[in-house]
From Swiss-Prot:
Name of the protein in question: Phenylalanine--tRNA ligase alpha subunit
Residues given in the record as Mg(2+) binding sites: E252
Gene that this polypeptide is encoded by: pheS
Protein family per UniProt: Belongs to the class-II aminoacyl-tRNA synthetase family. Phe-tRNA synthetase alpha subunit type 1 subfamily.
Gene3D superfamilies assigned: Bira Bifunctional Protein, Domain 2 (3.30.930.10)
Origin organism lineage: Bacteria, Pseudomonadati, Pseudomonadota, Gammaproteobacteria, Enterobacterales
Amino acid sequence: MPHLAELVAKARTAIEEAQDVAALENVRVEYLGKKGHLTLQMTSLRELPAEERPAAGAVINQAKQDVQDALNARKHTLESAELNARLAQETIDVSLPGRTIENGGLHPVTRTIDRIETFFGELGFSVVTGPEIEDDYHNFDALNIPGHHPARADHDTFWFDATRLLRTQTSGVQIRTMEKQQPPIRIIAPGRVYRNDYDQTHTPMFHQMEGLIVDKDISFTNLKGTLHDFLRNFFEEDLQVRFRPSYFPFTEPSAEVDVMGKNGKWLEVLGCGMVHPNVLRNVGIDPEVYSGFAFGMGMERLTMLRYGVTDLRAFFENDLRFLKQFK
């Protein structure tokens, strides 16, 4: 096998000249494949005497191993070069500024709710919540609202059946609280409520917050003082506030509260009154011992007045151009 060393040398040269993995594979097939030059050397062993064949076979196998080692080394080099070239193409320019992540902001109605909760929390009020699917007793009967009252009509209320409805006010939370807790009581009840109405100033779902105090010797003076302080804090100015006599089935006497707008006109902002004795009796509280006041206000209404929004529906349209103004 005088030319075995020559084959190995040629194989090494071909391996070094291979410029990619595909070309290297062709070299492997040419020398080590089933019909490769070095593989065919094994067929020449039959021409040798039997005693020389083991030594000759060992020489051929060593030559094949040397070529295989050279192939492996060259393959590693080529694969590393290909990987580095690919990484170079995919290199991230770290000097390029990243995309700015825009922070979100609270919805204007949420801002209003948080602001009001903070104010009344400092006065010792607790925040309580209740079910949005309510029964007619807690939504109407316990609040001294008779069966013939217009609020019970289908065109004003979303009914599920004869006794279950989407609550029209958060007053039911007050009833549930008074059923479970004896005075003194000092709570506010924010939440979603539902009315069958939709126009520029009304939506089928809106947010309401009601407040309640029940204790001994609570008077209308306490009610007026509390709401005066609240409105001046909320609007951040020394507003003119007036109380107009009104009617609500669950309070007596009742009033609606107006503030003087910048245009010189009175603007209604909330309703209030002294808790009706029948409401206290319905929850097992003696009206001869305890008295209380309640108030209720629409969160969208107050938000519109605070920020000068003219169309209530804008709060529910998810228009970022509108919402970004309140960040």
